[in-house]
Regions:
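Predominantly a Rossmann-like dinucleotide-binding segment in NAD(P)-dependent oxidoreductases
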Residues: 91-161
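Glycine-rich beta-alpha junction loops
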Residues: 1, 89-90, 112-119, 167-171, ...
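Hydrophobic residues in well-ordered beta-strands that form the structural core
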Residues: 17, 57-58, 82-84, 214
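C-terminal helix-rich "cap/oligomerization" subdomain common to oxidoreductases
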Residues: 31-33, 250-293
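Contiguous beta-strand/loop segments that form the cofactor/metal-binding neighborhood of enzyme cores
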Residues: 149-220, 249-257
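Rossmann-fold dehydrogenase core element
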Residues: 70-87, 106-109
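Active-site loop of classical SDR/Rossmann-like NAD(P)-dependent oxidoreductases
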Residues: 237-249, 265
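Beta-loop-alpha module in the N-terminal Rossmann-like domain of NAD(P)-dependent dehydrogenases
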Residues: 2-74
Length: 293
């Protein structure tokens, strides 16, 4: 509670709680953010929706499609908003990339690499297992890192016609690294992720006329270049804020203007991502405990 008290004082929050159910009874706020371990998104979001609160839900949306569909139905039933903190599609430079896609000609390849060595992997090697490395908490590199890459690819090109996910698993059953290969008409998207190696964070979209290159991951999207036979052009714009802030701005706009259409568009995108994640896990034989509930 000491941390909660300090946080509340720093941000001018009138109250703080150590009882979630009691907090949801309060009427001085209308929105809950579920920044929790993956498997807890569903039960905590469900309680908030049933209490009549809007929910900003952390990525990945939840453990599986069954949970996703139930939460969406509850948001409609209680006439509240349910929006994923995707940190990708609200970025100004995502819009820039989308607007320049047509200048690349027919797309022939998409490659995204997201390697980020986890300090918790060191703990794992020493016998201490973090919840991000367990099926109990719906962990793994697909849910933690590659979800951004999937969101980016699906937002630009839609769902793939086919996919395969090849992984290296820990003894706990989750994917510590993996390569997700998604087939689209005319091209293949290859998304690689790792939590036990030091490597690149970059993305390329290759077309017959040119390439869009970015030396950051999809949740950041800075320093974006378009490369053609005529040369290299920096097309990215300055972003004053990070992806979290831009997503919060968008959620506030949707709620303040009661923009149901925009809310449904975001939910449709989130469901496509969940479909890809679930298919990828099935391909790799990854089963979360939530899948059996």
């Amino acid at each position: 509670m000491a941390k909660a008290a300090a946080f509340a004082e720093n941000y001018g929050i009138p109250a703080y709680f150590d009882d979630y159910d009691e907090m949801l009874k309060q009427d001085f706020f209308d929105t809950v953010y579920t920044g929790l371990p993956n498997s807890l998104h569903y039960p905590y979001a469900k309680k908030a929706l049933c209490a009549g609160k809007n929910v900003l839900i952390e990525k990945p949306f939840c453990s599986n499609l069954a949970e996703f569909d139930e939460l969406v139905n509850l948001s409609h039933e209680h006439n509240v908003y349910l929006i994923e903190m995707d940190r990708v599609t609200s970025l100004p430079n995502f819009g820039v990339i989308r607007d320049h896609l047509g200048e690349l000609g027919p797309i022939r390849a998409v490659t995204i690499d997201y390697a980020q060595y986890s300090r918790k992997y060191d703990d794992y090697l020493n016998g201490k297992i973090s919840n991000v490395f367990t099926t109990e908490f719906s962990g793994g590199v697909l849910s933690d890192l590659l979800v951004y890459c999937v969101n980016y690819t699906v937002a630009l090109f839609g769902k793939p016609t086919n996919l395969i996910y090849v992984v290296d698993k820990l003894s706990t059953g989750i994917d510590i690294s993996g390569a997700l290969v998604m087939k689209y008409p005319g091209f293949i998207a290859t998304l690689t992720g790792s939590k036990n190696s030091i490597g690149d964070k970059r993305s390329t979209i290759q077309g017959e006329w040119g390439t869009i290159m970015c030396d950051t991951v999809p949740s950041v999207l800075k320093d974006v270049d378009k490369v053609t036979r005529q040369g290299t052009e920096r097309i990215s714009v300055y972003e004053e804020y990070d992806g979290t802030t831009y997503t919060l701005f968008e959620m506030k706009r949707i709620i303040d203007n009661d923009d149901r259409a925009a809310g449904e568009i975001r939910l449709a995108q989130s469901r496509k991502v969940m479909e890809v994640l679930q298919s990828a896990r099935k391909s790799a034989g990854i089963v979360f405990e939530a899948d059996n509930r």
